[in-house]
Design a protein with these regions (language model features):
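Cytosolic regulatory modules rich in charged/polar residues
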Residues: 1-85
Length: 85
């Protein structure tokens, strides 16, 4: 699943690759050898599997967990926050 909900807000499967999301949506999510998927990016930051409806801020991204089990993240709402000037 990868769909635009509104400007700068998306619904993404956590299994999508960071490289794919960056190419398709120009998101500029940092890439790393530590992870390849959006779920991996989130867990790399949180160090654990987040719970449903948990809100996570990573840099200028706001991520709300829509669906997760105790083993993996399934679906997230991904928003880009405008940088404050």
């Amino acid at each position: 699943i990868d769909e635009i909900i509104e400007e700068n807000t998306y619904l993404f499967s956590a299994r999508l690759e960071v490289e794919f999301l960056n190419e398709k949506y120009n998101l500029q999510i940092p890439e790393s050898d530590s992870y390849t998927t959006l779920g991996g990016y989130i867990v790399n930051h949180t160090k654990e599997i987040p719970i449903n409806e948990e809100k996570i801020i990573i840099e200028n991204f706001e991520i709300i967990i829509h669906s997760a089990s105790n083993k993996k993240i399934e679906l997230v709402r991904f928003s880009i926050k405008e940088e404050k000037r």
